[in-house]
Amino acid sequence: MVFVGREHELASLEVQYNSKRFELAIVYGRRRVGKTYLLHHFLASHDGAYMVGLESGASNNLEMLSQAVYRATGMIETGKLQSTLPNFPTITAALTHLFEYSLDHRCIFIIDEYPYLAESIPSVSSELQALIDAYKNRSQLMLILCGSSMSFMENQVLGHKSPLYGRRTAQYKIKPFTYIEARQMVPHLSYEDSAIAFGLTGGVAEYLSYFREGDSLDESIISLFFTPTGRLVDEPSSLLKQELREPRQYNAILSAIAKGASRNNEIATKVDMTTGALNNYLKSLIDLQIIEKIHPVGSKSNKSIYTIKDSMYTFWYRFVEPNQGAIENFNGKLVYHQYVKPMLSHFMGPVFETMAAQYVQARIHQGSVPFLPQQIGHWWGTDSATKKQVEIDLVAMADIQADPNARPVRHLLVGECKWKNEPIGQDVLGSLMERARVLHGESYYWLFSKRGFGFVSDDERVELIDVPMMYEL
């Protein structure tokens, strides 16, 4: 797999390495997002060792730890995978040997899947705490703990009740790629097809690596999602089984959200559950970064709705899960062409809104946005004048106070996103200007179009942005 992005994370890891002091870096993020690949890339140019915690017993994990410590401390000859030396008798002995070695040597030690190690040897975090406190002022060890269990890493490693609380010197929450980064994984695809690949994978690095050069987009989608042996044909369901108890309930909830239910009571009705019971399931899905609870930009949270954050889950629950029988009977190609492909533009609507928000963020970094937004998101609500419901795809907002004696002035960048096969007309701009009126601010208007525009505008407040422009920043 080609190494893409992660420049900020790599630069920060290098700063930590060059400090020559004790460092404890916590790296976490959802499965398949590229954490391990990042750490291997970083370790390739430095001395150190890497181990993976096993979903196994304490003795197996102690063996893995012992071998990694021998490797880190130069006790395994170059080219040999394992030492003939006996395992350390305890985890304390293994880690103490590592810390002692680090008094005179700069060394990196990475424990991947740390939650598995901690589950098999529950005392490991406390033992690390004691060793860190004893050695931190003299040690040159750069210790990296990595994990995919979001709740474990946030609560039992970073949380204030963790023995390791306050010991970390940096933390890295590894997120899926933006659409611009995802493009580097599929350079053989057109811009439009790259956008669809981003939507189908949620920007997850490993999934993007499955798109083979030489295959058309249709061929890739069919082979990944709509064949019995496809690599993504049961991926969301499989991940839920790894992460959660009662996967059947979570499947039902995600299916309901993917098909349009967004408010607590709507979802509860669809899955035949009380709203109180539902809240616990929703919280777990939020912790896993599969769904998110959002509210209109600048508004109170009592208008909040739930939406699937990972667009691959939306695609899977909307198109793959309902057709699993046909896929198992080798009719997935027919399913794709008859039922899925005609609906791809509809599926891409929210994905394109996500891309537009990421484009605005990229422009902010370039310094080419009229003002610095304090919030970016969606807006929906009621027009007090017409009493009609209003939705705006993209709103970037800031209340700017230029004079300490004056009231802040609201600045708005409002956007409309159209993933359609025809150019946008001027009526879309007029509609956006009318709807933006309800937000009461000094507004700029950005239109995002899959297929360009049927008009030009000389209004300095207006930008017309097509897909190639979004990729050619």
PLM-predicted stretches and their roles:
Residues 297, 306-473:
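A cross-kingdom feature that marks ATP-driven nucleic-acid transaction machinery
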Residues 1-333, 337:
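Phosphate-binding site recognition
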